Amino acid sequence: MVKQWFGVSRFVYNTTVKLLQDSSLKANWKAIKTDILNGLPEWSKSVPYQIKSIAIKDACKSVSNAKKKLKNGGGMSKIRFRSRKDTVQSCYIPKSAVKDVGIYHTILGEATFKEALPQSFGDCRLVFAYRDYYLTVPQDVPQQKSDNQGRVVALDPGIRTFITFFSECSFGEIGTAANLQIQKLCFRLDKLISKFTKAKCKQRRRMKLAASRLRGKIKNLVDEFHKKTARFLVDNFDIILLPTFETSQMSKKAKRRIRSKSVRQMLTLGHYRFKQFLKHKAFETNKVVMDVNEAYTSKTVSWTGEIIPNLGGAKFVKSPSDGQVMSRDMNGARGIFLRALVDTPSLKECIC
């Protein structure tokens, strides 16, 4: 029955998007809701009203955001239809339907949650991702109060080492060779996908389910890595200097200087998702994340100021003048730290 809810929600969303392709219609979900709901087929009548109603609202919001982006000069955005083949499906669940005994328990029956529900929460979404069901429950959490001790840390994101950090009193690496375990799972996934075309119907279905489980395992490993790293940073530092790590630009085929294997490792580690999550945790704990410029910090020897033009993919940086050697990632983090102290006037305000 839950799969039917996802299907009807998807059908209503796609119907609304198709209707709004007519430029004469405004994306006002309350104005078009009644006509759309009355025109739905008989097999969708048993699905709760609010699930269908909010699917219309979601479609109108997507169209409105695309129009707003075009108006503000952000370029044309194409609103795509939802597909039953999407790895993540979701539908709206009102908070009145969520009880300790389950979701819509009078329809679905009683169910148990892995975690206790908070005392007060808002409207939820039921998510089906990588063969598992999740109920996302929003709640209001007050911002934590903390004393600003002026502890500054610079981060250097990378591929071989996920994060290298450097501060006034400490330095280190987080996730040294973190991508090795993830890459093993990626290779297993590639090997499994390569067998799809040779498999028969039932075997192919089992393989697709196994591939979905592997994708979920990879995503869960990366998410856990992000959360533990963010927790360490916000617990030990007050100001976090994070360079603008342009993964989308670095991975474009036309201009990139790194191989496809490195591109895959970089995209799998999800540096942009980590950046967004870190900013969220920093706001929650009353800490500051500052976007800084990392230009030439890897090529510049941080203790002499010399520039090494042909550094390439070297793991270490060696000073031409004194012969001292430092890890490339550590040199980059130290360079970001020193550069931010000079080039970022707002840093002084945050420290004080």
Give residue ranges: language-model regions:
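Detector for conserved single-position "signature" residues within domains
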Residues: 1-41
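Residues on one face of amphipathic alpha-helical coiled coils
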Residues: 8, 12-15, 19, 58-61, ...
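Stable alpha-helical structural segments in soluble proteins, enriched in small hydrophobic residues
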Residues: 16, 54-66, 330-343
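Short coil/turn segments at secondary-structure boundaries
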Residues: 18-22, 29-31, 70-82, 199-209, ...
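Surface-exposed helix-capping loop/turn segments at secondary-structure junctions
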Residues: 21-25, 68-72, 282-288
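Acidic carboxylate diad motif detector
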Residues: 29-129, 264-268
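Positively charged, helix-rich recognition surfaces that bind polyanionic ligands
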Residues: 129-352
